[in-house]
């Protein structure tokens, strides 16, 4: 019988002792496995996973390893379960947990910082100094499900209560898996960027973060919101999510198009989500003097950046890691 010291369960949500899971073998290899259902400890709950999204970072981990770090090294052949964009139902409460109730639908953030380092105390838990280290003890240190600890490619997972977001009944399971993806864009534009309603935003790259960045920018009152990309079907979705203008960079010069659409002076913000090698140099030419460029993606190779242009035009360039 599934149980643990001080753990609360309900007969309405029976929990097995073992579950099906995917584990990472060699690079590029996921294998089915049976694992014990984890038991929540203090400040944790057990989530029955109802839906999972697949992020491009999951594929990076599966095929290359980083940014996952298991036991201080590569994640291969360590019985590690990836996956970090998931939602589900709370089915067990760890000792003393009363912030959530059994049966409640939640979506999850990735990171539960160590809570002790300088960055965590500042609220920047995705920049936790103990990422992947955990002081040698996962109970004391940083957790990043799907990165430093088991993730969501399984039937059940334990999450710290600080990583949970309650979701309304009107939101579908599939939509809920993308809440934290939207949070990544929001973190870059508001918490770090300071976006004010009426300011102009360009989003480059209509992947999941980029498309949700369009929706977030529009909801926050940005005007206009311009989306650039290479695929008309993705640009069409961007229109549906609120983009005032879309630019297919295969058909026209992105910088020229953005400046034309914004009266020639450049925009206030660029949210760079493409990871293209030339993206930074294009972005710094899309923004107005004193504008801000937020990097939510990056190329795999080193790139040359026009630093003199950044300095002469007082452009702010910053990166974001995850949702907070």
Model-based region annotation:
Residues 318-324:
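Active-site capping/gating segments
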């Amino acid at each position: 019988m599934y149980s643990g010291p001080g753990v609360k369960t309900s007969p309405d949500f029976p929990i097995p002792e073992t579950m099906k899971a995917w584990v990472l073998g060699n690079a590029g290899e996921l294998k089915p496995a049976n694992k014990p259902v984890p038991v929540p400890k203090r400040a944790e709950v057990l989530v029955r996973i109802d839906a999972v999204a697949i992020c491009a970072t999951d594929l990076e981990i599966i095929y290359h390893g980083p940014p996952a770090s298991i036991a201080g090294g590569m994640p291969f052949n360590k019985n590690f379960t990836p996956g970090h964009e998931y939602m589900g139902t709370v089915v067990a409460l760890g000792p003393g947990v009363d912030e959530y109730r059994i049966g409640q639908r939640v979506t999850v953030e990735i990171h539960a910082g160590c809570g002790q380092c300088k960055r965590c105390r500042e609220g920047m838990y995705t920049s936790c100094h103990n990422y992947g280290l955990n002081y040698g003890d996962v109970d004391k240190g940083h957790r990043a499900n799907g990165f430093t600890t088991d993730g969501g490619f399984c039937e059940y997972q334990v999450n710290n209560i600080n990583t949970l977001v309650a979701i309304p009944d009107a939101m579908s399971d599939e939509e809920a898996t993308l809440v934290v993806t939207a949070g990544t864009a929001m973190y870059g534009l508001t918490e770090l960027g300071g976006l004010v309603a009426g300011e102009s935003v360009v989003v480059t790259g209509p992947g999941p973060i980029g498309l949700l960045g369009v929706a977030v920018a529009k909801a926050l009152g940005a005007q206009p919101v311009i989306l650039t990309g290479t695929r008309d079907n993705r640009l069409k979705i961007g229109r549906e999510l609120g983009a005032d203008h879309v630019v297919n960079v295969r058909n026209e010069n992105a910088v020229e198009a953005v400046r034309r659409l914004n009266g020639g002076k450049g925009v206030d913000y660029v949210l760079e989500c493409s990871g293209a090698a030339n993206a930074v140099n294009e972005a710094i030419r899309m923004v107005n003097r004193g504008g801000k460029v937020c990097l939510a993606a990056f190329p795999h190779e080193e790139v040359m950046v026009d630093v003199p242009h950044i300095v002469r035009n007082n452009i702010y360039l910053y990166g974001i890691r995850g949702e907070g």
